[in-house]
A protein has these predicted regions:
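Core RecA-like ATPase module of SF1/SF2 helicases and allied nucleic-acid translocases
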Residues: 3-172
Length: 172
């Protein structure tokens, strides 16, 4: 169970060095759930909530602090010049290095730490991404969630984009 393995990484660590952080990010970047839609039970929000709930079951000792918890991946959905973050930047939430009971987010593409409290409230959880937002990214394993009903958003081109995000395996 990939989710249990992911949770265990965070459960076992109390402090992180850069090598451990890089390993955690490598594990996180192996898998991604992609969807064409934002709303509904197969939409982005619902999929992220389902993964989040399952993950928190594997981290019984950790309490959510509002929307924040150790292991939460987040994606910026717009540019924030004050923070130096761009639309599409993805970070991972870790225990704060100096503040007890606080979280901070590491953005690996920028090699930058930002306290979770400084990030915008509408930052998006990123276990699942829209196919559109995944363009330019690659993952070892991709799970593509397709709506049961016809969706004007789903085209052969979009499906091709989703499939080509996978390096090793695609599950539809």
């Amino acid at each position: 169970d990939q989710l249990a393995d992911y949770a265990q990484i965070f459960d076992e660590q109390t402090e992180y060095d850069q090598q451990q952080i890089d390993k955690i990010i490598e594990v996180f970047d192996q898998y991604r759930i992609l969807t064409a839609i934002h709303h509904g039970n197969l939409g982005l929000k619902a999929l992220n909530e389902q993964v989040e709930a399952a993950l928190l079951e594997h981290l019984p000792d950790f309490q959510k602090q509002g929307d924040w918890y150790i292991g939460r991946p987040v994606m910026m959905t717009y540019n924030d010049y004050q923070l130096g973050l761009s639309n599409g930047d993805i970070g991972l939430c870790f225990k704060h290095r100096t503040q007890l009971n606080e979280c901070e987010v590491y953005f690996p593409s920028l090699k930058k730490w930002i306290a979770a409290a400084r990030l915008p409230k509408n930052i998006q959880t990123a276990f699942a991404l829209t196919i559109h937002k995944s363009q330019g990214s690659e993952f070892d394993y991709v799970y593509i969630v397709i709506p049961k009903r016809d969706s004007h958003l789903l085209s052969m081109e979009l499906l091709y984009t989703a499939i080509t995000r996978a390096q090793k395996k695609v599950t539809i």
